Amino acid sequence: MNLPRANPPTSAVPATSASSLARWITPERAFAVIAFLFGHALVLVIPPFQAADEPFHFLRAYQITDGVFISRQHDARGVAMGEFPVSLYQVWLPFSYMGFNLSVKASLQDIRDGLRIRLNPAKRMRIAIPSTAYYSPACYLPQCAGIMIGRALGVGPLAMLYLGREANLLAWILLGYASLRAAPMIARPLFLLLLMPMSMYLASTASADVSTNAFAVLFTATVLKYSVLPQPDSIGPARFLALLMLSLAVCLCKFAYVPLLALLLLIPPRNFGRPARYAAQILVLAAASASVWLFSISIGPGLDGKIRLTDEVSARMQFQWLAHHPLRFAPVLLQTFRLKGWVVLQSYVGLIGWLDMFLPAAFVIGYLILLILACLPNDDKPPLPPPWRAAVIVLPAVVCSFLIIALLSYLYWTPVQAAFIDGLTGRYLIPLSPAVFLVMSSAMRRDSRFRWPCSARTLNALMVLISIFACIYFLAVVRNRYYG
């Protein structure tokens, strides 16, 4: 007699646990976790003041917490100055020899000694802040919050620096998370951009570039979200206020990125409602942004301000030379691309310290290729603006912003009549990158050959693994630079 076979015992672990985990790993959640873990590691591993201009960013943030929102003091050379506690200079001094010198390593004893220095705000001295005095307080909102917490707790200036770094990192994570939530159609390249070594290095310091980059990225992501809303009249007061605040933030942080406001034209007029309402709201956005932009220019250095402290650089003389020879700027740009193009790409992906150390060429090239591949779609959802519309609006705005950045670098950082532009670094391209991703992603969707043959979950998991590897490698390189 044949007896029926018993079914094998089922596992106590649900079969759907792996798929549930895969569903949970969205780009914004993965970014928040990875950025939080590796960002805090970098905050501690990067020695004090070891990012480009971090001492001056810290001084400017402290100056704002003193109530000096617009810096007006200058010395006889036209260099911006400020009155600061002597202790801020004392904590910087032991670390001032590390920049541009790979042989000098960090000392944990110097950090411990620096943490023992008290603020003593009554004892002050004049300190030059040539490169950051003209920055708007909007660039330093997180750092100021950290410093004010430190002042309330009565800690020393070096502890305030670390609190400013912490606040900067948390702001980067929060705004990056919001950007990824707003623009799932470009989430993969945006994810890689936000976790790129250069982005994470800056986010772990007191640099003003963090707010500048984060606001520009969130502005682009928000405009992209609003441009594909399915219902007419979908931009109500709350969404319009978000557009207005982000537009003003972009203008306040760095006016070279004001051309990005042209991306507002990606939003169909019907999304604002009636034609009269659309015209009125666009007029409000334009007028408010123009006012803030003019304010930013008014508090700038002017042509007589000195940012690079060398007699060979004069913004006024450079401007006068360009005014008489405007066609010379094109050959200067071409020569810059020829001589400095690779350096710009290197400093876009990852740069350690004060131009101290670049990542290997293979890593840089590989990461750039990954950014391009991440723009490839695996389906047609969520929607994107048509490629022709995206290109016509976005590319002129990006080119215009880049030309402004190049011109400012030529005026304020390059010797007069030099054949190429000095001071042009790749980190200035980070705020422009999401707009470029938008154009690339929209164009690739037009051709069915440009498709990933796998699911979005698989792509997200692969992207997370690559980013974790890149962060671990970068953290090891930074540690070896300063403590190896």
Question: What residues fall within each predicted segment?
Answer:
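Interfacial juxtamembrane loops and adjacent helix segments
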Residues: 68-163
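Start-transfer (signal-anchor) and selected internal transmembrane alpha helices
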Residues: 1-40, 279-285, 386-395, 455-465
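Membrane-lumen/periplasm interface segments of multi-pass, membrane-embedded glycan/lipid transferases
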Residues: 293-381, 484
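Transmembrane-helix signature of polytopic, membrane-embedded enzymes
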Residues: 153-158, 177-198
